[in-house]
Amino acid sequence: MTLQYPTIADCVGNTPLVRLQRLPGATSNTLLLKLEGNNPAGSVKDRPALSMITRAELRGQIHAGDTLIEATSGNTGIALAMAAAIKGYKMILIMPDNSSAERKAAMTAYGAELILVSQEEGMEGARDLAERMQADGRGKVLDQFANGDNPQAHYTTTGPEIWRQTEGTITHFISSMGTTGTIMGVSRYLKEQNTAVQIIGLQPMEGSAIPGIRRWPQEYLPKIYQADRVDRIVDMAQSEAEDVTRRLAREEGIFCGVSSGGAVAAMLRLSKEVENAVMVAIICDRGDRYLSTGIFDAPN
């Protein structure tokens, strides 16, 4: 018997691209959403998680049975926990304690060990602790923030999928920026196909907090980030991102997280500035891992 998907790992990628139906954009523009929550562990991070582990294996840097360590705000941790379960690794994940209960529970459900740092220490503190644990010989850090296999996963899969699905007509790509792996890899691929494609990054405005993305201090800026691969950065208020997240669920039937709502909010803004554009925004995960945060409790 030949199976199309022999293992759960084979289900990663080739996610749907759908058209925005009801939220207001300029009528001459085509607004499209890449549904990365359809990946088996529920987010765009399934792609780099498998890439980082598989390519490290091919280089002989890690072997089944090793202990892997990673600092994460949520989605990468869940994806790595899944990948570690598939491939036989022990996974230690370090994250801020203000992350949603659902994300914490998903990691431990896959068998990962979870270490929490304080909200005040944040992702910077989580990253520092991961490095100290590696130095103490407690495991090997994959380091999504500096690991070239992170953007490479999007260069070889996400970018080509978007180009194929839009039949080469894409004019704008919009993505929230956390590790920046998605936007770096997709930008590289799309710009190789058409240098005119505009790459738009999203970050929280000063004083705003949007789960999964950061406004990094210079000393913690991901090493994989290359500023010249992004044409424009949009600062987004938490309130606007949350509002669009709720509207996506209630008006489009698309249940996603706040960073995805922020990406769509940025796309709606941009749509008012141009005509005859084909815009693609990344819907990086699903809304069920944010239910306990209360963002969906606000009235219509």
Regions flagged by a language model, labelled:
Residues M1-N300:
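PLP-dependent amino-acid enzyme catalytic core
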